[in-house]
Regions:
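Nuclease-adjacent, charged terminal/linker segments that flank catalytic cores
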Residues: 2-5, 69, 84
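S-adenosyl-L-methionine
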Residues: 107-127, 401-424
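Alpha-helical residues within the helix-turn-helix
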Residues: 33
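Positively charged, polyanion-binding regions of nucleic-acid-associated proteins
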Residues: 2-30
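Nucleotide-sugar donor-binding patch of glycosyltransferase catalytic domains
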Residues: 390-396, 402, 409
Length: 424
């Protein structure tokens, strides 16, 4: 039972047993053999007893693991004890409004499609189990903030850098040669009580190189729609400039091999109308030199049509998009908390097209509302997304119902179910 895959399956088997029970409740005596059958094991595993602890008292570890899964499902709000009936548990009607963080060791396939899976659990517990080559890791990490958001984070720079490196390390080991890692990081981090910016980003780039051998390909600027900030230093004290962008740090494990994988022709942008007229009129009309001869113009230059404009390393994408609006509607319908930091689908879409081909595996180890998974799904890439907060992954599942092969784990139906039924 030490296999992470078997532990993941055991957790799912326990949840499903209650879903399939006629009255949604089971005694532990009824539950144990059902789980054994679903796991494809011999019933003898329920009889094996081994010494435990200093006293050496003999216990059945398989039954203990099942009870551990029960307790986890209880924390999710999926299971509850039946009052006055010892050892009897029942499927709850709905999870609550608070965020439910996965306990250490919990790994549940919350939902899946033909192309990907969304897993509820800690990425540190799940990434070690990925057993195939990864072409791209694209993830928006919890930001380094003085006051962490509801979804977590740390305020200590050194701890934050170590946190990122530890979360990435198992993925680096599974990255294909020339594969890419793209990390969305804040540019709005300041020294405590001062208007001077933190240099955590620069420290992180160096640490990722020294510790994990990751080379910096680019620091792509994502310019979104931001409220004025930093509020105190820009709006109150009038010292700082308002921040307008976030980092998307693009890294690779092999800059020589990435030449065979990245292709900017997959993300060409439309030419402007003025450029199209310029080309149609024959391009450059006269000879000229600029910058001490470093730039030369010759008649006829830029007169040949091209399929598009090469993208720059500044992405101008507003935060609102149809996919985000759909997620918000789904979360409200299920009466679940809404994620406080979402990016438009265009951002992961851009990097997935640039750095992968159809059929490649894309991983997001801080899945949030599973934006990376949705972008990968639409682009016919395989995907794995891991999210620590139950309510985020549950609400995200609704957007995938139209995808081929969609399956929502039965235990997830109970999360927010009361609101969905009331409003349905």
């Amino acid at each position: 039972m030490s296999s992470p895959h078997l532990q993941l399956d055991l957790f799912a088997h326990v949840a499903t047993a209650y879903v399939e029970a006629s009255n949604l409740e089971l005694t532990n005596t009824e539950l144990y053999p059902l789980v054994v059958n679903r796991a494809g094991l011999d019933q003898s595993v329920l009889d094996d007893r081994v010494p435990v602890g200093k006293s050496g008292e003999r216990h059945n570890l398989f039954r203990r693991k099942i009870r551990w899964a029960q307790q986890t499902l209880k924390e999710m709000g999926v299971l509850s004890r039946v009052a006055g009936r010892r050892g009897v548990w029942v499927l709850s009607e709905a999870a609550g409004k608070k965020l439910s963080k996965a306990r250490a060791g919990v790994k549940l396939v919350a939902f899946s499609t033909d192309l990907g899976v969304a897993i509820w659990g800690s990425n540190l517990d799940v990434t070690e189990s990925i057993d195939e080559p990864i072409a791209l890791v694209f993830s928006s990490l919890p930001y380094l903030l003085r006051k962490p958001r509801a979804y977590g984070g740390t305020t200590n720079e050194r701890e934050y850098i170590d946190f990122i490196c530890r979360s990435i390390e198992p993925l680096v080991e599974r990255l294909v040669p020339g594969g890419s890692i793209c990390l969305n990081l804040t540019a709005d981090a300041y020294e405590a009580g001062l208007p001077s910016q933190s240099i955590y980003f620069e420290r992180l780039v160096v640490e990722l190189y020294d510790r994990l051998g990751l080379r910096k390909m680019n620091d792509v600027i994502w310019e979104g729609s931001k409220p004025p900030g930093p509020t105190y230093w820009a709006c109150v004290k009038s010292v700082q400039l308002c921040w307008a962008y976030e980092h998307i740090l693009w890294l690779t494990n092999d800059p020589k091999r990435i030449i065979d994988r990245a292709d900017n022709r997959r993300v060409l942008e439309p030419h402007t109308d003025s450029h199209l007229r310029f080309v149609a009129n024959g391009g450059i009309k006269r000879s000229a030199e600029y910058g001490d001869g470093s730039h030369r113009h010759r008649p006829g230059g830029f007169s040949q049509p091209t399929p598009g404009r090469l993208p720059r390393n500044i992405l101008k994408r507003g935060n609102r998009c149809a996919d985000t609006l759909r997620y918000r509607e789904d979360a409200q319908c299920l009466d679940l908390p809404i994620h406080g930091a979402m990016m438009p689908l265009d951002v992961p879409d851009h990097f997935i097209r640039l750095l992968t081909e159809p059929g490649d595996l894309v991983v997001d180890h801080f899945g949030g509302t599973i934006k990376t998974g949705m972008a990968a799904e639409r682009l016919q890439r395989r995907w794995i997304c891991i999210e620590l907060m139950l309510e985020y992954v549950r609400a995200a599942a609704e957007r995938f119902r139209e995808c081929a092969g969609f399956h929502l784990h039965p235990a997830m139906e109970a999360v927010g179910r009361r609101a969905a039924l009331a409003k349905g």
